[in-house]
Swiss-Prot record:
Keyword Cytoplasm attributed: no
HAMAP family associated with the record: NusB
Gene: nusB
Keyword Nucleotide-binding tagged: no
GO molecular function terms listed in the Swiss-Prot or TrEMBL record: RNA binding
GO biological process: DNA-templated transcription termination; transcription antitermination
Name of this protein: Transcription antitermination protein NusB
Any Pfam family: NusB
Organism for this UniProt entry: Lactococcus lactis subsp. lactis (strain IL1403)
Length: 192
């Protein structure tokens, strides 16, 4: 067996010397100065690398802000791609093969409008749900139908009755009879 003694290594005593020479409550500048004096024997390139690695100020907030900005950019590009694919799917719903169709202006206005006003629409719809039901508890189909119809009622010139009837018909096609009655009730109260 053999034993490694750190005292034989040239760096270990220098680390101890650094900590001994470091003033109590030293500022970053004092720490850097002490480090450079203690490790002056190192080659200039090595000293520069250790100095920049150890004494470059970096805050957690800056690192998190950078990562958050990158994540938001990624999410935005993924959302744009998802929206594009969703529009293509909806436009080709009845087609045997997907075609490159142009979205009607009103369809684009509805989709973009619902996305822009999502929080307001959810808050308005939630006012007309019972205390035991939250908006997030609704099925995704019910959420989408209620958002589109409430957007039509609040922000377009579509007659309110037409918006409600379209919502009820959509819920019959994509959900069940119980859901269509529920949507009719929520939207009827929404109009009052």
């Amino acid at each position: 067996m053999f034993q490694i003694e750190l005292d034989e290594e040239p760096v270990a005593p220098k680390v101890l010397e650094f900590f001994k020479n470091l003033p109590e409550n030293a500022t970053a500048e004092q720490s850097l100065e002490t480090f450079q004096k203690t490790f002056s024997f190192l080659h200039e390139n090595v000293l520069e690398k250790y100095t920049s690695d150890l004494f470059t100020p970096s805050t957690l907030k800056e690192e998190l802000d950078e990562q958050l900005a990158q994540a938001e950019n990624n999410a935005q590009s993924q959302l744009s791609e998802l929206l594009k694919n969703t529009k293509r799917f909806v436009l080709n719903y009845d087609n045997d093969r997907p075609e490159d169709l142009e979205a009607p202006e009103y369809f684009t206005q509805l989709v973009d409008g619902v996305l822009d006003k999502k929080e307001d629409l959810e808050a308005n719809i939630s006012k007309y749900l019972t205390k035991t039901w939250s908006f997030s508890r609704l099925t995704l189909v019910e959420q989408a139908i209620l958002q589109v119809s409430s957007y039509e009622i609040l922000y377009t010139e579509t007659p309110d009755v037409v918006a409600v009837n379209e919502a009820v018909e959509l819920s019959k096609d994509f959900s069940d009879e119980k859901s269509s009655r529920f949507i009719n009730g929520v939207l009827t109260n929404f109009l009052k």
